[in-house]
Amino acid sequence: MPSFKLANYLRTHRKRLGLSQDEVTFLLGRQSTALVSVHEQFRRLPCLRTLLAYTVILQIPAHELFAGEYQKVEQVVSRRAKRLIERLATENPDQRTARKLAHLRTIVATPGTRV
């Protein structure tokens, strides 16, 4: 059974660095700390630009900041990759299909250890 991950670690890393919500809000170019609070409480996912800004500010990769969400997405993609492997296995085994299958098998093989 996979270990449980928190939905996100924004607050953990922000506090570890000694940054206030107000300071992170300023670095994000926002006016109100409400957005940072909403993200820390995982009531809403940040947009891509804000996610990238968090990675710059906190110096932590996105998959670590949002470990729980990453884990969920990884599991879903792994299940889909298994289904795609089954579909592709019925095709002619040309070089292109072989490359696809090899890549898909790496997705399925070790969920939780990639990145």
Functional labels for PLM-detected ranges:
Residues 1-16, 103-107:
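A short, Lys/Arg-rich alpha-helix, primarily the initiator
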Residues 56, 66-115:
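Short, charged recognition helix plus adjacent turn
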Residues 29-46:
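Recognition helix of helix-turn-helix/homeodomain-like DNA-binding domains
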Residues 8-27, 78-89:
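Short basic helix-loop element that most often maps to the first helix and adjoining turn
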Residues 10, 21, 33, 48-51:
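Helix-turn-helix DNA-binding elements, focusing on the entry/boundary residues of the two helices
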